[in-house]
A protein has these predicted regions:
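An interfacial alpha-helical scaffold signature
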Residues: 1-319
């Protein structure tokens, strides 16, 4: 199998273009759990016809699909972008035949074991993956009773939500200076998202990859906040938060926050305690000075100009 994978891998990466299956309801790669191996997979195709045949399999389940063309120079970025969402296998299809290749044969995850946790890029593959599975199912245009395993998917996502810490973008005011001091003195501005109906939300991000995808060239910095702190970070004029607005875009309103706090208090406490320990380690190590975080190991794929089918999803409008 290793030899077969070696030649198959070489065959895949030598192609000038691949078509990746994206889910229209999440603006992210379509994720699929293999019913036998239970590997979390993303599917790629040698041509458009192969993708269309695959998409047809899911049309009856009302799962919208679109093919995104990935140019050869963007392969590293694309496969690297699958690491933060917890994918373990890539399934390649050509001429009706499919084969699964472990993701780590395309791209290696950076070893951060010797880096203090507060300096590592924030990662949250469990939250990302369960969120994608949930939204693929929840946004199907079918009656709720026809949605497969919706309750269990929802519970698994909420547990991961309760355990998580998030990145919240801020704009630091007043020029140069210690960021922590500016935060304490209120010299920061929060980033808001204004909806077409007039509602205002604040973006939060599950990981550094999603934050950087949203940030692009803007001079945003990030506050790290556990789930337990979201309620206090939401003023009266804000309806809630949008998790990963450049990706699956999940609304987290006050009702959902209260539900999670009530149903999963132990998980919320674990997440808050873990965040406190990381922040305390940063204070003790830096002695009050703020050092630049390690950059995320991969960049978001840039499909503009490389897709003959559709463009990669953009960001939600931002004020």
């Amino acid at each position: 199998m290793a030899i077969d994978n070696h030649f198959l891998l070489k065959k895949v990466i030598q192609k000038d273009q691949l078509i990746a299956a994206f889910c229209g309801s999440t603006n992210m790669p379509f994720v699929f759990c293999d019913p036998v191996s239970f590997e979390d997979q993303v599917w790629i195709f040698a041509d458009e016809d192969g993708f269309k045949e695959f998409a047809q399999r899911f049309s009856g389940k009302k799962i919208p699909m679109r093919g995104v063309a990935i140019g050869k120079k963007n392969y590293s970025a694309f496969f690297g972008s699958l690491l933060p969402i917890g994918i373990t296998e890539v399934v390649f299809t050509e001429n009706g035949a499919s084969a699964a290749i472990p993701l780590d044969q395309f791209v290696k995850k950076q070893d951060m074991s010797n880096v203090p946790e507060f300096r590592r890029p924030l990662e949250n593959p469990a939250l990302q993956l369960t969120g994608l599975y949930l939204m693929q199912e929840a946004r199907r245009q079918v009656p709720n009773e026809e949605k497969d395993d919706f309750q269990s998917l929802n519970e698994e996502f909420l547990v991961n939500l309760a355990r998580s810490r998030f990145m919240m973008p801020i704009e630091v005011k007043g020029g140069a200076g210690n960021v922590e001091q500016k935060i304490r003195s209120g010299q920061i501005g929060f980033v808001n998202l204004n909806m077409k109906n007039g509602d205002t939300y604040r973006p939060i991000f599950s990981d550094s990859f999603e934050f950087n995808k949203f940030k692009q060239k803007k001079n945003f910095q990030a506050l790290t906040i556990p789930f337990a702190g979201l309620k206090q970070a939401m003023p009266k004029n804000v309806k809630g938060f949008i998790l990963n607005p450049s990706g699956c875009s999940i609304v987290i309103n006050m009702q959902l926050i209260d539900q999670v706090l009530k149903v999963f208090p132990e998980e919320v406490q674990k997440g808050a305690e873990e965040t406190r320990k990381i922040m305390q380690a940063q204070v003790e190590t830096n002695k009050g000075s703020v050092k630049a975080p390690v950059k995320a190991p991969v960049k978001a794929p840039l499909a503009s100009g490389h897709s003959k089918i559709t463009k990669m999803p953009g960001t939600t409008d931002q004020s």
